Structures are given as structure tokens and as C-alpha cells.
Amino acid sequence: MRAVTFGELLLRLSPPGDERLLESPELHTCFGGAEANVAVALSHLGVRCDYVTRVPDNPLGDAGVEALRKEGVGTRWIARGGSGDRLGLYFVEPGADLRAMRVVYDRAGSAFARLDPHSIDWPAVLAGADWFHVSGITPALGEGPVAALAGAIACARARGTPVSLDLNHREALWRNRNPRPLIEPLARRAGVLIGNTGAVSAMLGLAADDASLATPERARGLAEQLSARFEAKRIALTRREILGPREHGWSAVLYDAETRAFAQSRRHRVHVVDRVGGGDSFAAALIARLLAGDRPAAALEFAVAASALKLTVPGDFSRASVEEVEELLRA
């Protein structure tokens, strides 16, 4: 099986431990980005995955490409920018007790934001692909990325390749712009929608909050509403319950419109080490198990367990293997 993801690669910088961003004498670095995180997680779950992006032709771009190669991700379709391009950055200040986690983006004018949508040969990229995954972050980054994304989804649909869209609402990237005019047309073309109630409300305009997933009946109602409005075959919604400063309840639901099957996962109580990448690892594991032919309920339980494991390790990438996830499921 082969999957393809498309989005921006970022360099993440974080202070160690619980230190504050501008009060620490050092910053730890790693690479990330929603779609890159999905590609890495898929690779570790045994799915061959190619990642499509654009990075600068400089040492930071070189390091990013090499980091992906080390994780087993295909980098053939990564374009290189000119000498004046830059790699997008983001800074993460871990939260502690009453202090919430803080994220600061520095990605305006990046090599990816300046992407020429006509520079990607999507028929060649998607030839032989069994799945195509994107996120709602890309449309916020500029006209080039959103045009490339629309062209990619159109190409995938024409080829009969399943498309998943993780809504991934990032308020700071939209800068008070309304995301709905860009996101809703993409959502109507994606066969699988992934997100949480906050993203559903902000990006698709449906009334949804934490209470929407509080009972199976409410969760199913929201999923059916999403499926009917956007003609999606599957709806996956994650739920994060804050039980303490670093204690979270983590669960999800999955609705299959073709069979009208609805599944609700068990709730994992997780001591969170790093919450970044949790949703991405959920998306990756769900894709991996649907590609493997699992029934929706089994695929959902696997995805929730895999993403719960990701919450226990630092950094953006999930390196959980199938065996590790299955061991957790047996526990």
C-alpha cells in the first residue's frame, strides 16, 4: 500500500522542560508539520508514504529532507526553492499546571507559501497511490498552496484515490479571516473528514462543542449531519477531555455513511508529555488500518491507541509500530 501527503514542513523550536520560551537560554529543535507527521507515522505503521512539499535550497531544507528520509518517508516529490526562500518555523512553549501551551508561528513568506501550483505533476505523484491525505492548514498559507491543494484533490478524485481531510483549525494562521469559503469546497471533495468539534464549528460552520460528543446519540447525530452536508463517506471525530494539568482523556468516534455503522472508542487516560501531533498520529493510524481492510470499529480503536501513545513522547513525530499499538490494545 502507498499513501501520499501534501503540506508544509516546519522546524520546531521549544525550550527544555517547563521553561518559558523567551526565558530559556536554549531551544531544542525538531521537524514537524501536520502532513509530515502523518507521513512519518504511516511509515512506521508499515505503509509506504511519499511526502509532497517545497523547502528552501539551504542547510535547513537539506536537514528537513534528510530527517524525513531517516523515518522512511519518500522524498522524491519534495521541491527545492531558491536561495532567497526560507523554511517555516514554529515555537512551542509547553504548558504547566495553570499555564497553557503556547504556539508561535513564523512561516509567512516560506518556500512552501510561495509554491507555484503548476509546478507539481499530480498525475505522476498520485500514480499508484492508494490514499491521499491533506489538512485544513494548507489553505491558510497562501494562494499557491490552496490552488495546489485543490488541483491535487481533483486529480485524486479523478483517479479514484481516497482523499482524507483533517480539518486542523489553526486560528493564528487565519488572522481573523473566515476559513469557510476555502475549506467547505475542499470538504465536499474529500471522502473522509477528520477533526474535533472545535474545528467543525470554526471551519465548517456547524454548531458543535464538547457536549456534541458526550453521548453516542449526540456524536452519531453530528457525524451524520457532517456526512450528509459534505457527502463524506466517513467521519472521524476525536475528543480530548482535560482531566488535570497533564492528564487527558482521549477517545474518538467513527461513522461510515455507506453502511451507517457507528463506532465509539474506549477512552484512554493519558499522562501527556507532548500533545503536538496527537491528531496527526490518529489520522495516520486510521488510514493505515482502513487500507489494511479493518472493520471501522477495529480501525478506530487502533487509531485512538496509536495516538494515545504519541501523546506520551516528545516531538511531533509518532514512531509507534503496529506491535506497540496492539500491545496497548491488549492491555
What spans do the regions from the language model cover?
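Active-site beta-loop-alpha junctions enriched in small/polar residues
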Residues: 108, 137, 168-172, 198, ...
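Hydrophobic faces of well-ordered beta-strands that scaffold small-molecule active sites
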Residues: 51, 163-165, 193
